[in-house]
Design a protein with these regions (language model features):
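A short acidic, leucine-rich amphipathic alpha-helix
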Residues: 50, 139-146
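Membrane-proximal, non-transmembrane interface segments of integral membrane proteins
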Residues: 130, 135-136, 140-142
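Single conserved hydrophobic/aromatic residue that forms the stacking wall/gate
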Residues: 145-154
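Short, amphipathic alpha-helical interface elements at domain boundaries
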Residues: 1-129
Length: 154
């Protein structure tokens, strides 16, 4: 029996956060930057503009973009993949009148976790670990030498 974990058209991604964990305020900063930069949406995360507007180095700018895309706060514009727009989820949570602009409610954090763990193409590691690994604990040995169960489970 073949054990399928990803669809045929899934594009796996195992990097992009530049080794930076998601930090408090990053999603709001990314949301506001994309929302307020409608004249040139491709410039928001460019090296010069990103460093200036976010006040961080270029690797952190890339990480902020990664986390905002991974959680679904922003999305690439269809015809211009290097340009971004805010999503309905981003508006619902992070807008001035949104439900939790600073992501302080535990429910918002759980939603972010669910988005990370449920999207295989951008968040392949989280998807794999939280959906296909039966381990009760997380330790380096278990995941360094990861093997699939002999039979699929639901």
């Amino acid at each position: 029996m073949q054990y399928r974990t990803f669809g045929e058209d899934t594009k796996l991604q195992f990097s992009g956060h530049e080794t930076f964990p998601l930090r408090y305020g990053w999603l709001k900063k990314a949301y506001d930057a994309v929302k307020n930069n409608v004249k040139d949406p491709a410039a928001v995360f460019s090296a010069d503009e990103g460093i200036r507007s976010f006040g961080v180095g270029k690797n952190m700018v890339a990480s902020i973009r990664f986390w905002a895309l991974s959680i679904g706060i922003i999305a690439p514009i269809a015809k211009t993949p290097s340009a971004y727009e805010v999503t309905d989820l981003g508006k619902l949570i992070l807008d001035e009148n949104g439900g939790d602009p600073w992501m302080e409610d535990p429910a918002s954090l759980w939603l972010a976790h669910w988005k990370l763990a449920s999207t295989a193409d951008r968040n392949s590691t989280w998807y794999w670990v939280f959906n296909h690994c039966p381990h009760v604990t997380f330790d380096p040995v278990s995941y360094t030498h990861l093997t699939l169960p002999t039979t699929p489970y639901v």
